[in-house]
Amino acid sequence: MIFITGGSCQGKVAFAKEQFPERILMPAYQFSVEKYVKEGKDPVEQTEAMLQMNPEVVIIMSEMGCVPEKAEDRILREQVGRVGCYLADMADRVYRVTAGIGERIK
């Protein structure tokens, strides 16, 4: 698995398509995490199960910004962070993309 992260609208998907054209892409994975949280499912467990079925996938997830005022939004930020840490740990390679430039960080 390859994990690509970075801020919103920084060119992560274009970078992934250019660098890994043969791989299945899962862009905006933070929205999958949000769905799992809303359904009361553990997003790390759901991600682990997905990776078992798709070990060669490229997962693209935006970093989430400042700490929000609402408690439910803070919970989501925390869960996205936990999933990001899990993905980085499990990934063969990790890239951070800024302004369309990917930097390998693992």
Q: Which role fits each region the language model picked out?
A:
Residues 1-24:
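Glycine-rich P-loop/Walker A and Walker A-like loops and their local beta1-loop-alpha1 context
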Residues 2, 33-37, 66-69:
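Short, basic, glycine/proline-bearing loop/turn elements
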Residues 3, 25-27, 58-60:
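Structural motif
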Residues 6, 28, 99:
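Active-site donor-binding loop signature of nucleotide-sugar glycosyltransferases
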Residues 10-11, 32, 102:
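Glycine-rich nucleotide phosphate-binding loop and flanking beta-alpha elements
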Residues 17-41:
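Conserved substrate/cofactor phosphate-moiety recognition/catalytic segment
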